[in-house]
């Protein structure tokens, strides 16, 4: 059973809606690009949180202080964007959700796409006052290696590997299904349409009522994007194996590979 905070009604926000909120300063916009890129230019009123800064946090308490410094309180509406097809932004948004923040979405385009549309950018940094944010860990959206190992015995659990196809063929967690992160996007948007996403799952034989666990190579960026892609079509029970395949290998857990892969295996979406 998922907690209320694991239910996401709108995983992404469109450009028109984001613009209107930015213009009246009713939203906290987080730019997840590198600091030097942010300093050159960014979307109007955005604050900067490079993913590396977030990943350096060694506890939820440390991480929540990063968000407090960005002026994010419990009731702050947050939109996150990047310039890497939504993967880094997804990891930041997921972390906010994990620590208990309920109102966070992804901008449905990248920074480059925003700029190509001729929308407002700036070099000015907003003046932000630190605030307080409560810590309410949401365990229902995270999978550990132990949880994953136990869940694999359940017939209604699906494990999705979001790495590149070749990486999957060489090594993967036994029983996982490969949906490369590149398959999640559509032209001009970081995620497929809902209908297209449902068709993708159907083509892989993945039921929408299953518990789905996503993973990628190391820190949960590519699989974070998959997490929100699944949430976009209303799948209620999705978890991110945040430490992903890197940890799985380090723990010397079982690993599978596909022998004698054909051209189709390599080129499959």
Spans of model-derived segments:
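A mid-sequence, solvent-exposed acidic-amphipathic segment
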Residues: 151-200
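Cysteine-dependent PTP/DSP-like catalytic domain, specifically the C-terminal lobe
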Residues: 239-265
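Thiolate-centered catalytic microenvironments shared by cysteine-dependent enzyme domains
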Residues: 2-9, 54-143, 211, 216-245
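Flexible, polar/low-complexity N-terminal or interdomain linker segments that lie immediately upstream
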Residues: 1-40, 86, 108-170, 256-269
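Append "and occasionally in soluble cytosolic enzymes with long acidic Gly/Pro-rich linkers
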Residues: 57-67, 193-208
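Acidic/glycine-enriched edge-of-secondary-structure segments
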Residues: 44-58, 180-189
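Terminal peptide-recognition signature
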Residues: 46, 96, 176, 230, ...
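Conserved beta-strand scaffold positions in the cores of enzyme catalytic domains, especially
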Residues: 29, 46-48, 104-106, 159, ...
